[in-house]
Structures are given as structure tokens and as C-alpha cells.
């Protein structure tokens, strides 16, 4: 998951198009052979249209109820403006929020409550350092 924060506008959240239609932090699953950083860049672009640089790891959430682990990374977009949404299949809306909406995902609620303040100048990590072994 990506924590993308604009000092004036708040934190970037995406609203799911289907299911419970919850507000969530951008992110998704890592494909086999894909690094964490590449997966997050791909997911953020697919969901928001933004290109981002990935910074430091901010938090970890063990989702044992879903057999998953959520990792939260700082991310800095190449542009503050959000591109159009005509090609997004899974996401209905993308917008910055100063407070957490009522219909937020469990992961968004957890990371929002655990935040310590705005993320500034987070160091980047190499994309090649976190890869699955070849199958």
C-alpha cells in the first residue's frame, strides 16, 4: 500500500468500484517474479494513474483473517494532479482526504490511526532488493 500525502490536500485514497465500495490506500498484490517496489508502482498507477517513487517502509499489518500481510510504504507522486479515470476497472474515485471517510477499509483505518504526521523526503529503496525466487 502507498501513503501519498499532499501537505495541503491530505492523504490519497481510492474508492472501490465493486464489493463494499470502501475507501482504501492505493495498492494491491505482488505478482510472481515481481519486486515489492515494482508491484506497488504498478498498482498505484493502475488505480490512480499516478507515477510514484517509493520511499521507506512505514508500517506492517498482519491480516491473518485474510492470510495476507499489508505493507505500507511512503510514496511521492511525479505530479500532484490526479489523471482522468476512464481506464480504471476496479476503482470508482480517487481523491485526497484530510480526514478518514466513514466507509474506509480495515487497513486504511489501521494505518490512518497509526500515522505520526506527514511523510517528508522519505529515502527510496532499490527495486531489485525484494524479489521472489524464480519458479
Where on the chain are the PLM-derived regions?
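Conserved N-terminal beta-strand and adjoining loop/helix that marks the start
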Residues: 1-11, 29
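Nudix hydrolase/Nudix homology domain
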Residues: 20-23, 89-135
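The catalytic Nudix box helix
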Residues: 25-57, 73
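Short strand-connecting beta-turns/loops that link adjacent beta-strands
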Residues: 7-9, 18-19, 65-66
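Short, acidic/hydrophobic/Gly-rich beta-strand patch recurrent on exposed beta strands
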Residues: 13-16, 74
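Vicinal oxygen chelate
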Residues: 55, 83-91
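Conserved positions in beta-strands of structured domains
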Residues: 5, 55-59, 78
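Active-site-adjacent beta-strand/loop module that shapes the phosphate/pyrophosphate-binding cleft
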Residues: 61-84, 95-96, 100, 110, ...
